[in-house]
């Protein structure tokens, strides 16, 4: 289940960060379908996945607040943005943000789009640091386009006319989403970068939601075109060929791979300025500038 994968990712994040898990103020789990048991398509979100993760971790502190975030594929980035807001407001010093999904239990086997869907989870600790340290989130940008694009991604019937079950499956208007993404995401990245006061030449990596390699290529190319610049080599790490599209989990799992030098010619070092960007159901778009 998604909550199991979220727990495994959370354990690793807590271990890597060397924090005391009882000191966490918030656990935020971004997902879209909750836990979905085998042989059924029923979505289970009661209790929240965040509460289930807290229970599995064995955290006893009642002041560790848990909630789920339903925001489409950009959910993990939005969770990080919310965690930063809590810290800035003095409501938290440490937050655990997880993106987890089991799309293998929600897709239509008769839909060719389903072959790229996968399961996964990625977790991060967002922690308050000294203002003197020039690291962390520099800027962010979020938009929801719900006038004409609300139902570009939706739950619908199987493409198999002989499928008479009442189950609903992930469906999308693929071409419409593609055109939307390659327009809105590059602009969000640009707006976000300009808010950070960093130059386009400072950007070392761009981490995009792994929905479609062709679409991600187009988004990055258009982003650099906004600056009348060619796209730098190795600027965009990719994992979809290996891990598929796990929705909210694609960016945190991709970040983990690059951070641990698991992708050829892709690495990060202290001081690097990186961009995150995602697009998904809503339709939601967000971006974040971060300094390692």
Language-model-detected regions and their locations in the chain:
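Short acidic capping loops at alpha-helix termini that bridge into adjacent secondary structure
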Residues: 20-26, 62-65, 93-94, 199-204, ...
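Conserved active-site "lid/cap" helical segment
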Residues: 1-32, 36, 157-204, 215-219, ...
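Flexible, glycine-rich active-site loops centered on histidine and acidic residues
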Residues: 88-121
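Claisen-condensing/thiolase-fold acyl-transfer catalytic domains that form or cleave C-C bonds
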Residues: 7-10, 36-43, 47, 68-88, ...
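Glycine-rich beta-alpha junction loops
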Residues: 33, 102, 129-130, 141-147, ...
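Condensing-enzyme catalytic core mediating Claisen C-C bond formation in acyl metabolism
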Residues: 1, 110-183, 187, 279, ...
């Amino acid at each position: 289940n998604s909550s199991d994968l979220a727990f495994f990712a959370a354990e690793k994040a807590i271990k890597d960060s060397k924090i005391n898990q009882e000191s966490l103020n918030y656990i935020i789990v971004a997902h879209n379908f909750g836990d979905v048991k085998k042989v059924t398509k029923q979505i289970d979100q009661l209790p929240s996945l965040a509460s289930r993760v807290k229970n599995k971790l064995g955290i006893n502190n009642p002041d560790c607040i848990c909630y789920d975030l339903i925001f489409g594929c950009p959910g993990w980035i939005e969770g990080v943005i919310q965690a930063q807001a809590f810290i800035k407001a003095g409501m938290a010093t440490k937050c655990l943000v997880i993106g987890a999904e089991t799309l293998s239990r929600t897709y239509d086997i008769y839909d060719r789009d389903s072959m790229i869907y996968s399961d996964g989870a990625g977790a991060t600790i967002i922690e308050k640091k000294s203002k003197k340290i020039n690291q962390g989130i520099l800027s962010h940008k979020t938009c929801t386009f719900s006038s004409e694009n609300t139902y570009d991604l939706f739950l619908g019937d199987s493409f198999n006319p002989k499928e008479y079950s009442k189950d609903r499956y992930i469906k999308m208007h693929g071409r419409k989403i593609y055109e939307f993404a390659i327009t809105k995401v590059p602009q969000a990245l640009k707006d976000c970068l300009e808010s950070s006061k960093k130059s386009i030449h400072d950007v070392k990596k761009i981490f995009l939601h792994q929905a479609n390699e062709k679409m991600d290529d187009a988004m990055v190319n258009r982003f650099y075109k906004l600056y009348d610049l060619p796209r730098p080599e190795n600027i965009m790490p990719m994992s979809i060929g290996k891990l598929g599209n796990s929705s909210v989990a694609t960016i945190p799992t991709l970040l983990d791979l690059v951070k641990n030098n698991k992708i050829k010619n892709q690495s990060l070092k202290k001081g690097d300025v990186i961009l995150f960007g995602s697009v998904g159901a809503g339709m939601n778009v967000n971006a974040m500038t971060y300094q390692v």
